From Swiss-Prot:
GO BP terms: cell redox homeostasis
UniProt name for this protein: Bacilliredoxin SSP1241
Annotated organism of origin: Staphylococcus saprophyticus subsp. saprophyticus (strain ATCC 15305 / DSM 20229 / NCIMB 8711 / NCTC 7292 / S-41)
Domain of life: Bacteria
Similarity-based family: Belongs to the bacilliredoxin family.
Pfam families: Disulph_isomer
InterPro entries to which the protein is assigned, alphabetical: BrxB/BrxA (IPR009474)
Gene3D superfamilies assigned: Glutaredoxin
Amino acid sequence: MDLNFDLYMTDVVNQARNEIEEAGYEQLTSADEVDSVLKQEGTSLVMVNSVCGCAGGIARPAATHALHYDKLPDRLVTVFAGQDKEATQRARDYFEGYAPSSPSFALIKDGKVTEMIERHQIEGHDVMNVITQLQNLFDNYCVEK
């Protein structure tokens, strides 16, 4: 593999990580970290991050702007598909009934998936549409902060 490509991809991945972390999402990079968060009582929004265009152009901006709302999950976390493979696989173990998809969002309540917003509900949609989908999840499963 070309060194310039590797450096470029490292930069792209780091930018994607920083963007979602700056929005307030905690990076989970191991299966143990995923279990310690998702087994807790309450609600957790999991963003399955990726380097694809719809993650950077739609999913991450929606993940950021959806938080300007009265009802929010107790915890905001992210795993990175293709990068933190162990953490991503463990998170997907919680997404029972849903096929692997990235980018995507899962709302976990008391250790169980309630609903997901899958890639096909993100790709080809505008940011506002995904924000609305996220805030609908918050309305259905979260309490006012």
